[in-house]
């Protein structure tokens, strides 16, 4: 498995079997990703999108076979305009926008995506990639298990700064339930996790750690450090440095809205 970093730091994963390859995520849709990936493998490439956000999905139409959970179609379409991508790049490169030509940007094509289903298995020849639903960050968020390698690619589903505060995110309570479900479903099948931001590898305990962070939020014991993002006020559950490394030495974190802790907004 090969990790690929994008212009703005997101991490994609190329999984190669004996016959086929899977690319997990495609970042911003600028700079001809397919041309680069084809220097790494000569095998037919299938794309699995972990979710529909601008920094993960916009490069997908360069490829012929793309799978995404349709619950994220509206997110993908909303983030497809060129100005959305340029704004994201500028925000993540200190206000500087590289001198890209207009034809360096991939045109959106969600109508060509295939449905990515919970439990779907891709046979690559000697290796398999399994997609499993883990809604929370978005309603269509998926994780990818490579069982032969005992690796679980978590993407943005569960990491050191899981965003749970925008209109497309689930409540902390619902997210916790989904974490528990995936933890039980995949118990014993992976020994390490891979992320799509900041660091590549994390421990097999990442899901459990984030469940515990959710527990602290739901019991009023979180640190609740104010966090501002694109006009939205949210809170970082556990104190962390500028690289989202927890100050207590723990692993995993969430950034959430006080209005989205409970299902239906009602505390238990």
Give each language-model segment a name.
Residues 118-146:
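Core dinuclear metal-dependent hydrolase active-site scaffold
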Residues 15, 25, 37, 51, ...:
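Divalent metal-coordination and catalytic microenvironments
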Residues 135-167, 172-173, 180-183:
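Active-site-proximal loop/helix segments of hydrolase catalytic cores
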Residues 54-55, 140, 159, 200:
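Short active-site segment of divalent metal-dependent hydrolases/proteases
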Residues 23-26, 45-55, 67-70, 133-136, ...:
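Active-site neighborhood of phospho(di)ester-bond hydrolases with catalytic His/Asp-centered motifs
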Residues 30-123, 160, 212-221:
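Active-site HxH/HxHxD metal-binding segment of metal-dependent hydrolases
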Residues 1-39, 144-159:
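Conserved beta-strand hairpin/beta-sheet module of binuclear metal-dependent hydrolase folds
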Residues 120, 180-268:
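Accessory terminal helices/loops
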């Amino acid at each position: 498995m090969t990790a690929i970093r994008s212009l703005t730091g997101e991490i994609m994963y190329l999984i190669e079997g004996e016959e086929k390859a899977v690319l997990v995520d495609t970042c911003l849709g600028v700079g001809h990703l397919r041309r680069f990936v084809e220097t790494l493998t000569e095998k037919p490439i299938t794309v699995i999108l972990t979710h529909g956000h601008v920094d993960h999905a916009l490069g997908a139409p360069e490829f012929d076979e793309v799978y995404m959970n349709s619950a994220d179609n509206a997110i993908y379409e909303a983030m497809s305009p060129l100005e959305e991508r340029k704004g994201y790049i500028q925000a993540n490169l200190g206000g500087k926008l590289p001198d890209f030509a207009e034809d360096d940007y991939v045109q959106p094509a969600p109508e060509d995506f295939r449905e990515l289903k919970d439990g779907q298995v891709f046979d690559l020849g000697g290796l398999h990639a399994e997609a499993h639903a883990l809604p929370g960050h978005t309603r269509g968020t998926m994780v990818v298990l490579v069982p032969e390698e005992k690796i679980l690619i978590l993407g943005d589903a569960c990491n050191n700064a899981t965003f749970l505060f925008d209109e497309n995110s689930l409540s902390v309570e619902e997210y916790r339930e989904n974490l528990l479900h995936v933890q039980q479903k995949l118990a014993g099948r992976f020994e390490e996790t891979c992320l799509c931001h900041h660091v590549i590898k994390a421990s097999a305990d990442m899901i459990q750690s984030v469940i515990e962070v959710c527990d602290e939020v739901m019991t009023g014991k979180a640190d609740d450090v104010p966090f501002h993002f694109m006009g939205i006020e949210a809170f970082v559950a556990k104190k962390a440095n500028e690289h989202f490394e927890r100050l207590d030495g723990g692993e995993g974190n969430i950034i959430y809205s006080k209005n989205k802790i409970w299902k239906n907004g009602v505390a238990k």
